[in-house]
């Protein structure tokens, strides 16, 4: 087995799927670690091509020899909830002013999508986490 490469940095970014480019925020974050920015952009865009329109968080591990690998996460729950409710943004005063609503089935569907990134053992608990996010955004769960 090859010796493990030494990790020099971990970068977390949220980028539109298929739209990574060397402009900020991507360029400066990667440039600071000496990563080949265009190489990352091409790899990320190819990996997220089928998810266009979503924001896809990515965790980039940078190694001592300036090589890198990245792990894609699921889109943020807040973005998925806004899309399900058909809204542009959440409420400014979430507990007094509701801006939209989602059904429990939609919440479970989002929980299913987010399951691998959530700290939950089953779909019911995952749905509770997503419902809490919805409430904090001013979206009513019916």
Swiss-Prot record:
One function term, GO molecular function aspect: large ribosomal subunit rRNA binding
Protein's UniProt name: Large ribosomal subunit protein uL11
Cross-referenced InterPro entries: Ribosomal_uL11, Ribosomal_uL11_bac-typ, Ribosomal_uL11_C, Ribosomal_uL11_C_sf, Ribosomal_uL11_N, Ribosomal_uL11_N_sf
A GO biological process held by the record: translation
Similarity-based family: Belongs to the universal ribosomal protein uL11 family.
Pfam families, per the entry: Ribosomal_L11, Ribosomal_L11_N
Gene Ontology, cellular component aspect: cytosolic large ribosomal subunit
Keywords, comma-separated and alphabetical: Methylation, Ribonucleoprotein, Ribosomal protein, RNA-binding, rRNA-binding
Quaternary structure annotation from Swiss-Prot or TrEMBL: Part of the ribosomal stalk of the 50S ribosomal subunit. Interacts with L10 and the large rRNA to form the base of the stalk. L10 forms an elongated spine to which L12 dimers bind in a sequential fashion forming a multimeric L10(L12)X complex.
Post-translational modification: One or more lysine residues are methylated.
Known role: Forms part of the ribosomal stalk which helps the ribosome interact with GTP-bound translation factors.
